[in-house]
Amino acid sequence: MKLAAIFLVSCVLLSLLPSLTIAEKRPWCPTRKQIFDGSCNRTDYTQCFNDLRNTWDDIGDLCPTDCTCTPQPQNKRLCYCRYLPCPST
């Protein structure tokens, strides 16, 4: 009887182990686009990344990920960054 109880407890603990060791991953969005005021800064390639990052609560500290800036009418610019983590909701 003791052996069965020990075996049962061991199985339960081992089944919990993978869920404890796997870190929670944030979802990744396929694209992120947003329009901001001002013109595109051709010397600062992180401009769009920083602008998008500042509009979200907390996406962590990431390196810029394939961001582009496209001039728009009326002194606006379209920022497009691929593969940024989705903002938490």
Swiss-Prot record:
Classification via InterPro entries: SCRL
Superkingdom per UniProt: Eukaryota
Keyword field contains Signal: yes
Claim: Secreted is one of the keywords in the record: yes
Native source species: Arabidopsis thaliana (Mouse-ear cress)
Any one GO CC term of the record: extracellular region
Any one of the GO BP annotations: defense response to fungus
Location(s) in or outside the cell: Secreted
Pfam families in UniProt: SCRL
Cystine connections: 29-86, 40-69, 48-79, 67-81
Protein's UniProt name: Defensin-like protein 250
Signal peptide span: 1-23
